[in-house]
Amino acid sequence: MNATLLGQAIAFTLFVWFCMKYVWPPIMEAIEERQKKIADGLSAAERAAKDLDLAQANASDQLKEAKRAATEIIEQANKRKSQILDEAREEALVERQKILTQGEAELESERNRARDELRKQVATLAVIGAEKILERSIDVEAQKDILDNITAKL
C-alpha cells in the first residue's frame, strides 16, 4: 500500500465522520420533520373526509326528516280540508232542509189563507145569489150565521 492510498482513506474516513457528525443530523431531522408534516396532513385529510361523510349523512338524514315532516303536514292539511268541506256540506244540507221546511210551511200557510179567503168569497157570492133569487133581504146577523155555516162546510 502506498501512502497516497492511505492518505485518501484517512481523508475519506474524516469526511464521512464529519458528515455523520455535522451534516447528517440536520438532514435527518429535516426529513423526519417533513415525514411528520406529511403524515399529519394525510391524517387531517382522512379526518376531514370522514367529517365530510358524516356531515353529508347528517344532512341527508335531516333532509329525509324534513321531507317526512312536510309530507305529514300536507296530509294533516288535506285531512283538515276534507273535514272543513264535510262540515260545510253538512251545514249546507241542514240549511237547505231548514229553508225547504220553512218554504213548505209558508206555502201551506198561504194555501190555507187563500182557501179560507176563497171560501169566504164563495159564501158571500152564494148569499148574494140566494138573496137575489129570493128577492128578499136577510139581516146582517142571519147572513153572518149562514156565512159561518157555509164556510165550515166548505
Swiss-Prot record:
Lineage top rank: taxon: Bacteria
GO-annotated cellular components: plasma membrane; proton-transporting ATP synthase complex
GO molecular function terms listed in the Swiss-Prot or TrEMBL record: proton-transporting ATP synthase activity, rotational mechanism; proton-transporting ATPase activity, rotational mechanism
Chief location of this protein within or outside the cell: membrane
PANTHER family: ATP SYNTHASE SUBUNIT B (PTHR33445:SF1), ATP SYNTHASE SUBUNIT B', CHLOROPLASTIC (PTHR33445)
Family, similarity comment: Belongs to the ATPase B chain family.
Protein name: ATP synthase subunit b
